Amino acid sequence: MPTMSIRGVSLFVEVVGHGSPLLLMHGGPGLDHVSLTPFRELADRHTVILYDHRCNGRSTGAAVESMTFENLTADADALREALGFERWAVLGHSFGGHVALEYVLRYPERVSQLILMDTAGDARWSQEHAAEILAGRGYDAKTVAVARRFYCGRITSNDFVRASFRLLPAYDHQFSLLRLAREMLEGGWRMKTRPEALIFGGKMMRGWNVMDRLGEIGVPTLVLAGHDDFLFPPESQALLAAGIPNARLRIIERAGHNPQSERTAETIRAVADFLALATVPAPRDVGTAVLRPAPARA
């Protein structure tokens, strides 16, 4: 490490900590695991595995056309086997949540707990509704038009950086250049983007939908999201949680698409508490249980 040969692809992998394993699947596509590094704080009680999907970040050796759910999930399971874990908890953020859903549906016996963070069971929220949500929040017509193209992969590599910066403030509850600068100094500068993966992913995701299969998920599941996420707003999270038997729903206030960055302590605590309590079934008389913060530890 930090690279491992998995199914003929060189995956960038970081493993930290000790305890029961937790795999982190990053979003994008076209990004890397850096946005999920706040979860390294769980390394005192879990073996935390961060990696870059094939064709993303610093993972190399695969053509972008190979970035299919079949390959992405097979890569993850081959990584599990290579690391010697029988089962592991899986946290998927945004696009990584789509991969996590595909993974638990294809390899159900390998997942002990599932955390779906700011994601959905279909593509329509990001590809069909995000631009309209931005318009409703008062964003200018140019930003709305960029969003309509960006999340469907209808941009060029040359447009990627410019479009990303235009959309950047929309990801937060309250955009802060100071916080962005701090995050960059704390390691955000290491993020490696791959525009070709975003462009291909936008096309790959068109029509993707596993909402009718959510009832097959039999592991303890937490649906976790920022209240002000324009890509996956609370109503999408309620639908996702309602479709998964006994799923728990937690909405983080004053946070957007990346609650792990805006409300770090609260988000990490929600994940830690869920992993500790996941063996306790959610109430059966309520389709979706809300996981309340635990009392402060001494």
What label would you give each PLM region?
Residues 7-61, 65, 79-80:
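Conserved HGGG/HGGXW glycine-rich cap/lid loop of the alpha/beta-hydrolase fold
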Residues 86-128:
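Conserved hydrolase catalytic core segment
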Residues 217, 223-225:
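Short beta-strand/loop motif that positions the catalytic acidic residue
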Residues 230-236:
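Conserved alpha/beta-hydrolase "acid-adjacent" motif
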